[in-house]
Amino acid sequence: MENENLKKGILFLVFSAFSFALMGMFVRLAGDIPFMQKAFFRNLVSFAIAFFSLAKEEKTARLQKSKSVFKISGKEFLFLLLRASCGSIGIFGNFYALDHLNIADAAMLNKMSPFFTLLFCFFLLGEKIELIPLLAISTAFAGSLLIIKPSFNLTHFIPSLAGFFSGMGAGFAYACVRKLHSYNTSPSLIITFFSLFSCLISVPFILINPVPMTLKQFLILLGTGLAAAGGQFGITFAYYNAPASKISIFDYSQIIFSAILGFIAFHQIPDIFSFLGYVIIISMAAVVFFYNRRNSRT
């Protein structure tokens, strides 16, 4: 049974990785629509799906006369707000990067999030960081510089920095999710709150600079939202079936999918510096993965 759940966890995580890679391709395919408008549609679809799931949970809770999923403490609301704020920064940064970088580069910078999660869990949850993961984090940051390529060429540097901050925002958001898990907050409530918050943040930017869309662009953005929802729920079911210490490394398959889709759709090929950055970051993720796996057995 444990092996069966492990296989399910891996399959769900690879499905999630492919879905997020597909989302990245759709973001780029949508063309010259402002990234905030793209993010709005991504979050709107996710909100609709998550709210439907949340409504079902609430209905079940009422039938069983158990605690309402909407009944939360002040501390829970604070971490929901922090998760939504930093998650929104993560999405906006990621979408801006996807519009201006190779989609594999943008995906890799966003995948810095697990390293940031380790750091933020230290500050938020008091979780100890061992020497090996700390060295891996430092090396991964060095690897990210090969992708960012700091320079006075703002055309590349600013989108790269946005991609880096997308990983930072996502990392803080995941640390908040860890904290919310300790309060037994409904995952559907977390996703619903975050998606609605991001939608509302996007609205003023869309009103200031509305851009008409063709039917094709609308359908692509609908696909963006569906792919994002698939990725979000895939990762949720993955970690429901198996612990992160045994499957998290498979999340980096998104980089492979992104590179393939980027080549097929846009003829994008990462340069040698980006490729070296990928190798360093994924290698450090593997170091942390196997280190945690070994420690979980002792």
What are these regions (language model features)?
Residues 106-112, 183-196, 232-263:
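Helix-helix packing/entry segments at the starts of transmembrane helices
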Residues 8-16, 62-93, 158-166, 212-230:
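Loop-to-transmembrane-helix transition segments
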Residues 17-21, 84-92, 114-119, 144-145, ...:
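Hydrophobic/small/kink-forming positions within alpha-helical transmembrane segments
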Residues 113-135, 256-275:
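C-terminal transmembrane-helix exit sites in multi-pass transporters
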